Each structure stands twice: as structure tokens, then as C-alpha cells.
Design a protein with these regions (language model features):
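Phosphate/nucleotide-binding beta-alpha loop and adjacent structural elements of enzyme active sites
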Residues: 1-230
Length: 230
């Protein structure tokens, strides 16, 4: 069949509307990453979906770090039945465009969702962000499984910390993140505050084993986290 019968143009991009899980999403036909996977299969990362469904409760404050085009943001909002707050943090402006369209498409109550065009790390400032030809593989790290998909282009993006964002929007009860290896820096930055009792969120993240090495090692960070009761 001809996809041209089913797609529309949004922001000069070919966008395809597809049922995903129990909601709908606009997906970028030129993206061979998350959009392509959802067009083909209508779902992804079932293990994380199951974790979120079991852990998330109404009235929670969620930090969705690496919110991308909204696959999890919509899911989180529906699980909480619009009775909670989601801080959706995403450094790519292209992804944010689709994220906003997808929230509108699903009639999500956007007053309960804050979208921040930024990355998250262990410092506040700016950092070089390497762009990939798949919308879910942009990264701070040039090595690892994302390397073959990097375009050679980069942009400088704003960087915030979880603690910095918490002071503006409240402490997170639940953190979901998919940050292409940068979970090392983010979790490490939380350890001190968790130890002090400032916060103790549920943390759900996708590990990126190929992005770890002796100088960028998740193991000691997780060991420290486990000592704090995780």
C-alpha cells in the first residue's frame, strides 16, 4: 500500500499516525530509530513498560529524562490518569516538536506536564551533544553502540541536574531515563542527595553496556546506590 495516503506533513516532516499500545502517536517516516520501530511493531521495550505500570501511581511526580517523542510520557500520563506531574526533559528540539504534537493528539492535560528543552548531567551549563540518524540515539558519548549511527554533527545543549530541576518543579518520586550511557553521570549525581535523605525516587533506566569503560563505569555507581537501599 502507499504510505502517502496515510501520512501528513508537520514541520516539513512526513508524519505517520499509528496506534501505539492503547494510544496514538505521530511518527517520523524519515527516522529509522524509534519511529520506525513503532510503525512496524506498535510497541517497544515491553520490560520497561511492565515496570512502569507496576511502579507508577497517581499523584506521583515523574522526571522523564530523554523524553524523546513522548512514547513513555503519554504512557505515564495515562497510568496516572492525569493525576500527577510529569517533567519531560529532552535536548532535541526536533523530538520536542513531535512530543508536543503527540500530547495534543492524545488530549493529554498539558498543564500537568512540563517540557524542558535540556539535557541532564552532573553539572549545570552547556555540553556538546552528538547527533545520530536515529532520533533515539543522540548522545554525549561518541563511543559505544550508537557510534555507527552518528552523523558527524553536534550541537551545544543546555545541561541541568536532577537536583536543580527538583528545586524548580518538586522532588521526583519516579525517574525514567534513556540517555545513551549518560546514566552513569546522572545516577552518580544523585548519590549524595539520596544519602542525605533529600530524595529517594524509584529509578527506571535502560543500561547501555557498550558505553561503559574503566573511565566511564556504571558498576561502582550502582554498588553505591545499592548500599543506600536500592
Amino acid at each position: 500500500f502507499f504510505l502517502s495516503k496515510f501520512f501528513k506533513i508537520i514541520f516539513f516532516r512526513k508524519i505517520y499516525k499509528r496506534t501505539v499500545n492503547n494510544y496514538k502517536m505521530f511518527l517520523d517516516l524519515d527516522d529509522r530509530g524509534i519511529s520506525r520501530a513503532l510503525i512496524l511493531f506498535g510497541e517497544r521495550e515491553i520490560d520497561q513498560k511492565k515496570i512502569i505500570e507496576e511502579c507508577l501511581k497517581p499523584e506521583m511526580c515523574v522526571f522523564d529524562i530523554g523524553a524523546n517523542i513522548g512514547y513513555y510520557v503519554i504512557m505515564e500520563s495515562m497510568i496516572m490518569k492525569n493525576k500527577g506531574r510529569i517533567i519531560a526533559i529532552e535536548p532535541s528540539k526536533n523530538n520536542i516538536q513531535l512530543l508536543k504534537q503527540n500530547l495534543t493528539l492524545n488530549k493529554i492535560v498539558t498543564k500537568d506536564i512540563v517540557i524542558i528543552n535540556s539535557a541532564v548531567s552532573d553539572f549545570i551549563g552547556k555540553k556538546k551533544f552528538f547527533l545520530a540518524n536515529q532520533a533515539n540515539l543522540h548522545t554525549f558519548h561518541e563511543f559505544g553502540s550508537a557510534k555507527p549511527y552518528l552523523t558527524g554533527k553536534s550541537i551545544n545543549v543546555n545541561v541541568k541536574t536532577v537536583i536543580n530541576i527538583s528545586k524548580d518543579y518538586g522532588k521526583p518520586d519516579f525517574i525514567r531515563m534513556d540517555v545513551e550511557g549518560h546514566e552513569v553521570e546522572i545516577i552518580k549525581s544523585l548519590l549524595k542527595e539520596i544519602k542525605k535523605g533529600f530524595l529517594k525516587p524509584i529509578i527506571c533506566f535502560e543500561p547501555h553496556i557498550s558505553s561503559y569503560n574503566k573511565n566511564h563505569n556504571l558498576k561502582p555507581v550502582l554498588e553505591s546506590l545499592f548500599k543506600l537501599g536500592y
